Curated annotation (Swiss-Prot):
It comes from Synechococcus sp. (strain CC9311). Member of the two-component regulatory system SasA/RpaA involved in genome-wide circadian gene expression. One of several clock output pathways. Participates in the Kai clock protein complex, the main circadian regulator in cyanobacteria, via its interaction with KaiC. KaiC enhances the autophosphorylation activity of SasA, which then transfers its phosphate group to RpaA to activate it. In addition to its output function, recruits fold-shifted KaiB (KaiB(fs)) to KaiC to cooperatively form the KaiB(6):KaiC(6) complex (independent of SasA kinase activity). One of its GO terms (biological process) is circadian rhythm. This is Adaptive-response sensory kinase SasA. Its EC number is 2.7.13.3. The gene is sasA. SMART domains: HATPase_c, HisKA, KaiB.
Amino acid sequence: MDGIDRNPRQKLSLLLVAGRHHLSSRDLRELVEFLQNEDCGFDVSLQISDPTQQPELLELHRLVVTPSLVKLQPQPKQVFAGSSIFQQLRGWLPRWQQDEVVSGLGLSLKPTELDGSRTQRELQLEDQLLVLRQENETLIDRLQAQERLLRMVAHELRTPLTAATLAVQSQELGQIDIHRFRDVLKRRLEEIALLSKDLLEVGSTRWEALFNPQRLDLTSVAAEAILELEKLWLGRDVTIHTDIPADLPKVFADQRRMRQVLLNLLENALKYTPNGGLISLTMLHRTSQWVQVSISDSGPGIPEEEQQRIFLDRVRLPQTSAGASGFGVGLSVCRRIVEVHGGRIWVISEPEKGACFTFNVPIWQGQGQEKENVVLTEGQAEP
C-alpha cells in the first residue's frame, strides 16, 4: 500500500507556442520556471513549440499572436495570449484546482449556490467574460503589432527616397555622371519595391515574415550605411571615426534590418553633432555570444529622465536648443528590431557631453543556428 498514491494529481497539459527570443524575455522565463519548479497542484506537462517549425499549430489552435499558452488538458481547452500570460495563468489555477477537487469526489457542479453568493450560472458567465477579455486583448495586440509594422516600413521608406532625391539633385548639378546616377537610382528603386512588398504583407502576415536572419558581415553593413549617409556629412565639419577589429566575427541577423538600425542611429548622431564635432562607431566582441555596437556623438546629450522614454512607441522628444527635431519613431523601431534578434539597446548620455547608443547582436554559431531559424515575432521584454 505504501507504493500507492492515495491522492493522484490530475495532469495539467500545457502547450507554449513561442519563439526562442520570446523565451529569453523575463515574463516567459518566469512562467517556465514556475511551471517546472513550483508546486501548482497539478502534474504539469509543458510542451514548448516553435511556430516556425510547426506553423500548423497556429491554425489548429486558432492563434493570432505569439507567444500563446494553450491548456490542452483537462478540458475545456483555453488559450492565453497577450502581454500578461503568466498573470492570466495564475488567476486560473485556483479555479482549475477547485474543479479537480469536485471531479475527484465524483460530484458535478449543479446550478445551486456554491459559496453562498454565486451560482454555477454566474460562474459560467464569469468564465465567458474572462475568455472574451482574453480574445479582446489578443486582437488588440495584433492590431498594435500591425501598426508598429506600418510605422517601421514607412520610416524605412525615407532612406531610399532621400537618397534618390539627392542623386537627382547631384546629377542636375553635374556632381555625378549619368552612369553613377542610373546605378544609384536603380538600387534605390529596388529598395522601394521591397518595402512596398512589406507594406502589402503587413495586413496578412505576422511580424516574423519581415525578418530573415542569416550569417552576416556587420562590418560591411556599417560601411555601406556610412557611405549612404555621406551626402549628409561631407558638406559639414564633422569627423566620423570607426573602430572595428579585423577579426570581428560574423553575426546572425537580418541584413536589411541591421542596416536600418545603423542608418537610424548614424543619422541621429549626424543630426545632433555640431560642426567640428566627432561621431564614433565601434564594434567589439568580449564574449563568444554577442557583438556589441556603439555609436556616439558630441551633441547636446539626452536628459536622464528621457533616456528610457525615447525607445517607447509614440514618443517624440521636443526640439533641441539647436533646432534639430526630437527623436521620433526611429528609436522605437530600432528597439523592436534589436529585441527581435534577442539583443537589447540602451543609451548612456550626460547633458552637453553627447550620447552613446549601444546594442548587441548574436554571433553566428554555425549551420545549426540557421536551421533553427529563430522565430522573429513580437513580445520581447522591455530593456
